[in-house]
Amino acid sequence: MALKAVCVLKGAGETSGTVHFEQEDN
């Protein structure tokens, strides 16, 4: 999951980052 988070943050930015953070909390 951590690796995916990095990829998302690097690929997109704030929008994707927020979405990923929400999923992690879930």
Swiss-Prot record:
Gene Ontology CC terms: cytoplasm; nucleus
Keyword Nucleotide-binding belongs to the record: no
Annotated cofactor note: Binds 1 copper ion per subunit. Binds 1 zinc ion per subunit.
UniProt keyword annotation of Lipoprotein present: yes
Necessary cofactors: Cu cation; Zn(2+)
Purpose: Destroys radicals which are normally produced within the cells and which are toxic to biological systems.
The protein's name in its UniProt record: Superoxide dismutase [Cu-Zn]
Species this chain originates from: Paralichthys olivaceus (Bastard halibut)
Species classification: Eukaryota, Metazoa, Chordata, Craniata, Vertebrata
